Amino acid sequence: ADFRRTNNDASNTPSVWQNIAADCEIDFCLATVSPNGTATTGITRTSTSQTSFSIGSDNVKSSSSGGVDPWPQDDYLNIWVCDLSGGILGYATPPSSWPNPNDGVVIGYRYFGNTGVVQAPYNKGRTATHEVGHWLNLDHIWGDSNCGNDQCNDTPVQQSSNYGCPNFPSTSNCTGNGSNGDMFMNYMDYTNDACMNMFTNDQKSRMIAAINQYRPNLLNHNLCSGSTNPTSWDCIGSGCVDPGTGNGAYSSYNACFAACECSGNIYQLSEGFH
């Protein structure tokens, strides 16, 4: 929903930015065909003795270190849901690093989806939205520096990241910030899930360019069709995983998504979770 601007809170975008709030024309669906050609739900569950995983080691992405190996990254978006240490909500590999054997997105299970054990204020699936944005070449909206550049001309310059749920307008001491202040409701800021509700047109352009340049294979297969010779695409807008445990060991989850290009320039990426 977030990438199609069909999210229920889209109307919360301030009126001054409604005209640049984008339908990114990117749909996500769980893969229904596995790498070996068999039917799949697009979700795998792996019981492991590893109690947590870290961004530094990236060990969730390898079966040899207690995680699970990815499905072929040129055909699937892999999302690992696990117990992520260090207070990190999630992380992603940018497309500029492609080809990368660790390509994909990792989300802490407490911040994934919107039901079950998910914890407020990150309980509406926006961690996945944010990290998939990075996976599709979006920078943080503050440009990761004081009054930095996020490479998108239609986002205001802002001094740093925002947290919580600021009141609009919330201004920064930056040239180019303007009377409307920070676009803190943008998915690429750090505000609470309930306060995020938009991508911009320039962010949309960057994401579609990233698909075409770095991830074109996602558009040229039938892995989210439910059939190896599909006549239609079966896509869903949301999903969640219940991170249970097995025999006292934490269970990690890997969701695999594929993609196809549909009429009207809509990009369907078969997603793992969100």
Predicted regions and their residues:
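Pan-zinc metallopeptidase signature
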Residues: 196-226
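Stable alpha-helical elements in mature extracytoplasmic
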Residues: 124-128, 203, 210, 252
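Propeptide-to-catalytic entry region of secreted or membrane-anchored zinc metalloproteases
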Residues: 1-73
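Sec-exported extracytoplasmic/periplasmic mature domains
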Residues: 1-8, 134-141, 212, 216, ...
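Active-site-proximal segment of zinc-dependent metalloprotease catalytic domains
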Residues: 56-143
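Primarily marks secretory-pathway-exposed extracellular/lumenal segments that are disulfide-
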Residues: 223-274
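The catalytic-center signature of Zn2+-dependent metalloproteases
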Residues: 119-197
